[in-house]
């Protein structure tokens, strides 16, 4: 049985991802090993520093929250000890309930059952980030496989250079790295990213071979992701719509109906699972924020709620969040005895219609600062799809256009996960991870279009690769150094 399962995934999963390209296989394995080693080293350093600080206990920054929640689940409850919630209690019937999902708790079950481990948020964050980075690298490979099925590239050497730059940006430059801090807050976001990327990966593989199991894996991934971080449910909804759109064109009625139903399931079951957990915890489909202990007790939050008409989400926060998450000057390179980077302290931007002090800001970096190569690829992606689309269509037939449209729709679906952080009352560096799926797909597809349609020009072949290499290496450096800096001030 194991042999048949292994043979199945070899023929239908890895074949789609790598498509027999030895260079891509070797590059992905090497960068995967390098990036996971760096993640492990960074987190080990962060964990040791936090654990050795005086006055830090196992409940600090929700480090023990998910283990505590699992112990409650095993006893048929969903409440947690108030000290484990670390000031994040929703007080209902004199019991403390946390708003964080149950996936990170359930993922601890095998380790608790086998090794009897308790309170190990620190180790789980390593696992979540390794899954995130490796899944991101596989998404890059699968996108290249789908694209190269239809198009030849500008030249072998340039194509390999562009591919390596995207792999670097998907590993050492990945926004998931900004979740590399030993805390339950960061871990929940890291798992949300990991399962969102896995869901996208399985959808891409399904598109190539139309085998049902990969849509089932997509559904499972998004359910787990949604119960780690709600933004994953938004991505799942739009990915499900894309699957439905593809399924409608299937010539076989039985397969069309099957994939249509699975697409509906992907769109709605993840969000329904969140609503169910909320109902079991709070007795309502959406938690009342005025039951949160900090809203009535903390003057800071009381003032914010008063200024915004007691809202925690809304378009009133959109303009301020857009500026904060995309401003290009959010990182300072501070040269002292050791070169390090830090987010600017003056990045708080209360922009109309938001009133001053009407939002919660932490010191945060931005997408354009951390991934400058993304800015270039975003411009390429938009330009080729808006300005040059008519010229592009002359070079492709209907089958190829269908593949390109699918890839574009997947980009739009992955971009849906940024909606929640953009309309949320709080702005934090860890929320940058929510932008990760959209950044990864736009960066990869932009690079493919760049490789095909930009590097055909002799002038661009001489200048643009140098610019991209500089941007990529600079972004990877900023990403890693910012994690190190934030860890030291954590």
What residues fall within each predicted segment?
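Membrane-interface transmembrane helices that cradle and orient dolichyl/undecaprenyl
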Residues: 191, 196-215, 249-250
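Membrane-interface alpha helices of multi-pass inner-membrane proteins
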Residues: 201, 214-229, 236, 240, ...
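Perimembrane helix-loop-helix junctions
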Residues: 5, 235-268, 296
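Signature aromatic-anchored transmembrane alpha helix within multi-pass, membrane-resident enzymes
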Residues: 159-166, 264-272, 401-411, 415, ...
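Transmembrane-helix signature of polytopic, membrane-embedded enzymes
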Residues: 140-174, 194, 209-217, 408, ...
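Transmembrane-helix motifs of polytopic, lipid-linked glycan transferases
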Residues: 122-154, 198, 202
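Hydrophobic, aromatic-rich transmembrane alpha-helices
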Residues: 34-37, 338, 348, 352-400, ...
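Start-transfer (signal-anchor) and selected internal transmembrane alpha helices
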Residues: 1-61, 153-165, 258-266, 404, ...
């Amino acid at each position: 049985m194991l042999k048949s399962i292994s043979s199945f995934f070899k023929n239908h999963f890895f074949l789609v991802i790598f498509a027999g390209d030895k260079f891509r296989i070797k590059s992905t394995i090497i960068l995967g090993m390098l990036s996971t080693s760096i993640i492990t080293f960074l987190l080990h350093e962060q964990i040791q520093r936090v654990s050795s600080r005086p006055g830090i206990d196992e409940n600090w920054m929700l480090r023990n929250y998910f283990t505590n929640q699992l112990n409650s689940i095993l006893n048929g409850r969903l409440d947690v000890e108030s000290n484990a919630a670390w000031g994040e209690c929703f007080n209902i019937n004199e019991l403390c309930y946390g708003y964080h999902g149950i996936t990170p708790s359930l993922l601890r079950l095998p380790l608790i059952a086998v090794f009897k481990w308790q309170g190990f948020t620190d180790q789980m964050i390593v696992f979540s980030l390794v899954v995130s980075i490796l899944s991101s690298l596989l998404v890059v490979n699968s996108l290249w496989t789908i694209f190269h099925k239809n198009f030849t590239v500008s030249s072998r050497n340039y194509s390999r250079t562009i591919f390596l730059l995207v792999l670097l940006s998907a590993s050492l430059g990945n926004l998931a790295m900004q979740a590399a801090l030993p805390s339950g807050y960061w871990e929940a976001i890291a798992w949300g990213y990991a399962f969102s990327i896995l869901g996208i990966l399985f959808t891409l593989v399904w598109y190539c071979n139309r085998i049902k199991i990969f849509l089932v894996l997509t559904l499972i991934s998004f359910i787990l992701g949604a119960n780690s971080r709600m933004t994953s449910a938004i991505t799942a909804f739009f990915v499900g719509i894309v699957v439905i759109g593809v399924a409608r064109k299937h010539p076989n009625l039985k397969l069309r109906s099957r994939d249509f139903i699975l697409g509906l399931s992907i769109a709605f079951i993840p969000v329904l699972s969140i609503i169910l957990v909320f109902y079991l915890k709070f007795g309502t489909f959406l938690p009342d924020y005025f039951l949160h202990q900090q809203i009535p007790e903390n003057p800071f939050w009381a003032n914010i709620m008063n200024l915004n008409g007691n809202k925690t989400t809304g378009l009133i926060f959109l303009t301020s969040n857009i500026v904060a998450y995309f401003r290009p000057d959010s990182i300072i390179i501070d040269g002292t005895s050791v070169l390090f980077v830090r987010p600017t302290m003056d990045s708080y931007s209360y922009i109309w219609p938001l009133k001053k002090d009407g939002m919660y800001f932490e010191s945060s970096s931005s997408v354009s600062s951390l991934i400058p190569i993304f800015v270039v690829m975003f411009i390429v992606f938009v330009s080729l799809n808006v300005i040059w689309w008519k010229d592009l269509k002359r070079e492709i037939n209907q089958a190829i256009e269908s593949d390109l449209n699918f890839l574009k729709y997947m980009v739009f679906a992955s971009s849906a996960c940024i909606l929640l952080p953009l309309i949320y009352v709080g702005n934090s560096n860890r929320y940058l991870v929510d932008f990760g799926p959209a950044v990864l797909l736009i960066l990869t597809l932009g690079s493919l279009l760049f490789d095909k349609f930009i590097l055909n020009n002799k002038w661009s072949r001489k200048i643009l690769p140098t610019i991209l290499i500089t941007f990529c290496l600079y972004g990877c450096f900023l990403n890693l150094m910012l994690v190190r800096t934030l860890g030291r001030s954590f």
